[in-house]
Amino acid sequence: MTQLSLKKIYSGKVRDLYEIDDKRMLMVATDRLSAFDVILDDPIPRKGEILTQISNFWFNQLAHIMPNHFTGDTVYDVLPKEEADKVKDRAVVCKRLTPIKIESIVRGYLTGSGLKDYQKTGTICGLALPEGLVEASKLPEPIFTPSSKAEVGDHDVNISYAECEQLIGPELAAQVKEKAIALYQAAAEYALSKGIIICDTKFEFGLDENGTLTLMDEVLTPDSSRFWSVETYREGINPPSFDKQFIRDWLETSGWNKQPPAPKVPAEVIEKTVNKYQEALDLLTK
């Protein structure tokens, strides 16, 4: 990654944050990929640029629902030209917010950890669901299933809505739930018109200096969401998706124990993953 003259204040699984001043920071999406909470050694070329374009598209598309972390500044306003040229497609200037300490997950379809919970208990995060649902079943309505935020390298844990209220307070929990579902519904309706089913997604929210709930980080990318193609979707099977599921599936069959270090990912698996990300961008924004 490019060295920047700004001070790096945080390095996450995929994004690095740099300090601009006490109100703003620069968020740079790298080509790193994490799977099963382990950062893989092999970067995915152009992934950071594609994620940034998809996220920026959704921030603008959903701006009528709630405020977001954009400041209106460009990278050229905060970096020397030669640095800005290198990161312009993968970096955004954003507000410094106080992050809300939960992952706001909305599910419209049943799969993944939600399906496992449902098969055991008939519920997800304490929410009772109808009987007879199977892999990839559409849920009667989108559900808010929060999880606790883990440190880098730890696993997020699904929590009930009551636990969510305890963590962030009942008033904020109600606001987060309402906004998360509204964002999902608007995005899912739009994506469907482009041939994409948004199975589930994770939103990140923060509070600005006035306490206003603000959408932040990344929005509805293949890293934070499961996208399925309308053409290959059918109930009862796990549909192929436009995201890192392709690499996750390869890792599942590689015999890896899911502890660092991760195995080396073959070039063709990396290439197919890049193509999946690019296809999602093309479909959504065409």
UniProtKB/Swiss-Prot annotation:
Biological pathway: Purine metabolism; IMP biosynthesis via de novo pathway; 5-amino-1-(5-phospho-D-ribosyl)imidazole-4-carboxamide from 5-amino-1-(5-phospho-D-ribosyl)imidazole-4-carboxylate: step 1/2
Stored InterPro entries: SAICAR_synt/ADE2_N (IPR028923), SAICAR_synth (IPR001636), SAICAR_synthetase_CS (IPR018236)
GO molecular-function term, one example from the UniProt record: ATP binding
Reactions the enzyme catalyzes: 5-amino-1-(5-phospho-D-ribosyl)imidazole-4-carboxylate + L-aspartate + ATP = (2S)-2-[5-amino-1-(5-phospho-beta-D-ribosyl)imidazole-4-carboxamido]succinate + ADP + phosphate + 2 H(+)
Cellular component GO terms held in the UniProt record: cytoplasm
Biological process according to GO: 'de novo' IMP biosynthetic process
Protein name: Phosphoribosylaminoimidazole-succinocarboxamide synthase
Protein species of origin: Pasteurella multocida (strain Pm70)
